[in-house]
Amino acid sequence: MQVRKQQLELDMEQQTGSKKEKEYVKTVYCHPANLTYMQMKEERGKQIFDLMNEAYAPLFGYSALSDRQIDQYIKSYLGFLDLRLVPVVVDEKDQLIGVGIVMPSLSKALQRARGARTIFGYIPLAWSLFVHHAKNIDMLLIAVKPEYQGRGINALIMSYLIPVYHKLGYEFAESNPELEVNNKVQSQWDYFPHENHKRRRAYQKPIE
């Protein structure tokens, strides 16, 4: 099992006047979700979605997932993931503080399936997932516990994932939609060659 360890200095924002005190250093570990799919569902699945709710709560437009929705997502989707592409970050007490979830792009497979929900429609999807994947990877999400944000946890996840991408033959990565004002996630792309090739806009018009 590949494990990456990083010492993080956490600035506890307890200030006396303008003085900031560093109170402690914690050790965190980044490793693949080295579990069976059953263990992933039972042990980490709920933790991952709870972490998402906590990490994304301040973002505009985010609506927290209910327990019923979480159970449905775990049941429906976790079995499709390659757990090598699901790095988790835990603290010294094995508490989840960060996670990244990526998977092979299914865009071409869905085009070949033409929306068919028969066995013939699922064959291209299964082929792309388990036999011959695309050169593109879809970065579905990255979530970090709020008190660890801005401390390099996302860099730890990326430093684990990039060698895995190379090993598995991926050449390009596509991120999910991101808020332009979410500077924390936008700034992580400064270290990579990247292109912003899609932009969405929503407008409102008062009706009198």
Predicted features along the sequence, with ranges:
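Acyl-donor-binding surface of acyltransferase catalytic domains
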Residues: 1-35, 201-207
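Conserved acetyl-CoA-binding loop of GNAT-fold acetyltransferases
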Residues: 1-2, 188-199
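Conserved beta-strand-loop-alpha-helix junction that forms the acyl-donor binding cleft
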Residues: 9, 144-149, 175-185
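A conserved beta-strand-loop-helix scaffold within acyl/acetyltransferase catalytic domains
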Residues: 38-143
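Secondary-structure transition/capping motifs at alpha-helix termini
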Residues: 80, 91-95, 131, 163-171, ...
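Conserved acetyl-CoA-binding loop-helix of GNAT-fold acetyltransferases
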Residues: 136, 140-144, 149-163, 191
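Conserved GNAT acetyl-CoA-binding A-motif
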Residues: 136-137, 165-179, 189
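Long, positively charged, glycine-interspersed low-complexity recognition regions
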Residues: 175, 199-201
